[in-house]
Amino acid sequence: MALPGQQAVDYPSFKLVIVGDGGTGKTTFVKRHLTGEFEKKYEPTIGVEVHPLDFFTNCGKIRFYCWDTAGQEKFGGLRDGYYIHGQCAIIMFDVTARLTYKNVPTWHRDLCRVCENIPIVLCGNKVDVKNRQVKAKQVTFHRKKNLQYYEISAKSNYNFEKPFLYLARKLAGDPNLHFVESPALAPPEVQIDLAAQQQHEAELAAAASQPLPDDDDETFD
């Protein structure tokens, strides 16, 4: 039986909830996938837009029904109806705004209260912007909660597919699953400084080998 906002399809489909503070780029991220943007449906009872995002894997086609909050989070927490039946999730923060990272634990708690034991990806968005405030070494929450973390840039399409590939592998129980063709994405609006971002990725890898902070508060220099 299809869930609200989902038509029945004859290939695997999953409800993906995307959460995070307002302005972190969740809608921009989802809208990069042109087919999903064209076929989106608005669910007025819950106040969300549902974008069907198709990906083609070596095991066949899969679909993520991406639930986008349409900005509701700016007026307080999200209703449980947004989370119910969620099968996977992305928590997004903005690397240029520290508060959005500090609020990640709250989003994670709200998500896990309704959706138990689902695969979750933490995404640090806007890595194309020069004045980064959340440094790679300061991102430790994913290690504490055993989440996958990716640095992304929605406007440049940098790492767009990685969260979806990780979730697809987890949901399929197949670590060798891979995408056999790229989805149609909107053209990049900005260019990312790849050399600078590779340096951030190296710092992230180095930080992963360091002991975790003792307290729950993320430290900012």
From Swiss-Prot:
Keyword flag Cytoplasm: no
Gene3D superfamilies: P-loop containing nucleotide triphosphate hydrolases
Alphabetized InterPro entries for the sequence: P-loop_NTPase, Ran_GTPase, Small_GTP-bd, Small_GTPase
GO BP annotations listed: protein import into nucleus; ribosomal subunit export from nucleus
Superkingdom of the source species: Eukaryota
Pfam family, one: Ras
Region (Switch-II): 71-87
Gene Ontology molecular function terms on file: GTP binding; GTPase activity
Keywords (A to Z) from UniProt: GTP-binding, Nucleotide-binding, Nucleus, Protein transport, Transport
Annotated region (Disordered), positions in chain: 199-221
Keyword Aminoacyl-tRNA synthetase carried by entry: no
Positions annotated to bind GTP: 21-28, 71, 125-128, 153-155
Protein's recorded name: GTP-binding nuclear protein Ran-A1
